[in-house]
Amino acid sequence: MRTLILLIQFFTRIPLPIQINMDEINLKKGSALLPFVGVIIGAWNWLIFTLVSLVMPLPVAIIAGLFAEIIITGGFHVDALADTADGLFSSRKRERMLEIMKDSRVGANGVIAICFYFLFYGALFLSVPDTQQIGWLFFVLPIVAKGVTMLLFAKMTYAGSKEGLGSIFLGVPWWPIVIAQVIVLVALGAFFSYIGVIAYAGVILFTIIYRAFVYKRIGGMNGDTLGAGGQMGQLICLFCLVLLWGLI
C-alpha cells in the first residue's frame, strides 16, 4: 500500500498527507502497481467527462475530460511531451538536446507537439462510432499510458543526469513489466473485447519504434522521454481502436 501511495504522490497532484521515506520502498519492484495509478487518473477523467456530458454537448464534455487529466497530474507528462519535442527535433548534438529538455521554456516544437496532440486526441474521440464507449476510453487510456511507460523501463539506459526523476526506475526487473502488461490487457479486453487487445499490439509496435528513435538521438531514456512515451502511447491506442472499429 505504501508503494502505491508513493506512486500516486509521484505521478499525480492528489494531496495525500502521508510522509513516506523513499529509501524504505523498492520502487523498481513496486512499479508493477503503476497501472493502478492509471486507474485512479482514468476514474477521475471518466467522472468529469460523465458529469459534464449530462449538461453539455459531447465536444465540450470531451474537452473537459482531456482537461481533467491535466488537473489531476499537473500537466506533468504534457510538459514532458513538449520538452521531448523541443529536444529531439532541435537538430542539435546529444548534449545540447538534453540541455534543451531541461530548459523550463517551451519552444516552437513543443508548442506544435502539444497543439497537434490535443487536436488529434479530440478528433479521435469525436470519431468513436459508439459514443457510449467514450467514457470508458477516458478511464482505460491512462492505464495504457502507464503500461507503455513500463515497457520503456525494460533494459533502460538512462540518458539524463543521475539526479533526474526517471533514474529512480533504472533497473526495473522483467516481472513487474510483465504484470503491468497483463493488467493493461485485462483492462482493454474487459471494456473493448478482442479489439482492445489487438489495438495494444499497435501500441507495442509504436513503443518499439519510439524507443529506437529516442535511443538513436540521445542514447537512452530520461524523465521527459518516458513521460512523452506514455502520453503518445495512449493516443496511439485510441487511434488503433478507432481504426479497428472502422474496419471490423
Swiss-Prot record:
It is an enzyme of class 2 (transferase). NCBIfam families: cobS. The chain crosses the membrane at residues 24-44, 70-90, 106-126, 134-154, 168-188, 189-209, 228-248. Joins adenosylcobinamide-GDP and alpha-ribazole to generate adenosylcobalamin (Ado-cobalamin). Also synthesizes adenosylcobalamin 5'-phosphate from adenosylcobinamide-GDP and alpha-ribazole 5'-phosphate. It is a multi-pass membrane protein. It is found in: Cell membrane. Its cofactor is Mg(2+). The gene is cobS. Disulfide bonds: none annotated. One of its GO terms (molecular function) is cobalamin 5'-phosphate synthase activity. This is Adenosylcobinamide-GDP ribazoletransferase. Keywords: Cell membrane, Cobalamin biosynthesis, Magnesium, Membrane, Transferase, Transmembrane, Transmembrane helix.
